[in-house]
């Protein structure tokens, strides 16, 4: 499905991002995964190579909030492979602090990584995709961008900004054959969720009509569909993968 495609996946060392990287590799893509630290990036790449030594996977650890660092790293990837077909903006941080615990710096930190950093990847990639005649940009949103959450206001705010960015860029970049979509996961079995107390998790599962948590692979399958030619006429969509929890 992704043979001869070159993809960048930010936040690709664990959880949903790692599952997306693996799914893309299974379907023939060449993938460069971005992570925050050299150690975790190296470990993730080695883990994937152990699964299949023929997979074309490598890693990098640019500071996502540094526009110059991102431009430089993306330029290296373009020089090495000749093109960039897919950008997955998956890196981000969550938040559950009540409003009385907030500071301006706290809010800005979350917005910086969850929104501003996305643009640091999109801007150089868009120029490359325009030159090559098209491409695909995928963003990780969240169920709470649609329904909100009772605390941690910065996180749903940042993810709603991701939705707006997705809708607007889809309209602007469509004439250049660049598709822009987002995936909005619900409660997904990741390290972060697994660390929650069981007494907190079960009530959440009870609210999901399918009566189970999502798996990282469920979300990765949505990314695969949107990245593939099966979604060649799909752009400007926020694809919910939440078991109808938000309904």
Placement of each model-derived feature along the sequence:
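Conserved glycine-rich Rossmann-like NAD(P)H-binding loop of the short-chain dehydrogenase/reductase
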Residues: 27-44
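Residue(s) in the substrate-gating loop at a strand-loop-helix junction
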Residues: 142
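C-terminal substrate-recognition "lid" of short-chain dehydrogenase/reductases
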Residues: 134, 212-241, 246
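Substrate-binding pocket helix/loop in short-chain dehydrogenase/reductase
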Residues: 98-99, 103-111, 193, 204
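Alpha-helical segment proximal to the catalytic Tyr-Lys
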Residues: 127, 171-175, 232
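Conserved glycine-rich cofactor-binding loop
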Residues: 13-15
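Active-site helix of classical SDR
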Residues: 122, 158, 166
């Amino acid at each position: 499905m992704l043979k001869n495609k070159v993809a960048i996946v930010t936040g690709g060392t664990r959880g949903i991002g790692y599952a997306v990287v693996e799914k893309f590799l299974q379907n023939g893509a060449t993938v460069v995964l971005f992570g925050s630290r050299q150690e975790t990036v190296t470990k993730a790449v080695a883990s994937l190579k152990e699964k299949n030594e023929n997979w074309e996977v490598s890693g990098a650890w640019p500071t996502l909030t540094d526009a110059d660092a991102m431009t430089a790293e993306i330029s290296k990837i373009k020089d090495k492979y000749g093109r960039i077909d897919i950008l997955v903006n998956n890196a981000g941080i969550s938040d559950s602090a009540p409003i009385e615990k907030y500071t301006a710096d706290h809010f800005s930190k979350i917005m910086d990584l969850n929104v501003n950093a996305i643009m640091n990847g999109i801007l150089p990639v868009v120029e490359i995709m325009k030159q090559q005649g098209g491409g695909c940009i995928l963003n990780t949103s969240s169920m709470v961008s649609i329904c909100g959450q009772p605390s941690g206001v910065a996180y749903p705010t940042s993810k709603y900004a991701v939705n707006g960015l997705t809708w607007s860029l889809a309209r602007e970049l469509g004439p250049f054959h660049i598709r822009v979509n987002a995936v909005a996961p619900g409660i997904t079995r990741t390290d972060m969720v697994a660390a929650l107390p069981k007494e907190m998790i079960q009530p959440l599962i009870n609210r999901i009509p399918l009566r189970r948590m999502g798996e990282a692979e469920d979300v990765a399958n949505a990314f695969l569909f949107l990245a593939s030619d099966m979604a060649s006429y799909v752009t400007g969509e926020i694809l919910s993968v939440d078991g109808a929890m938000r309904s």
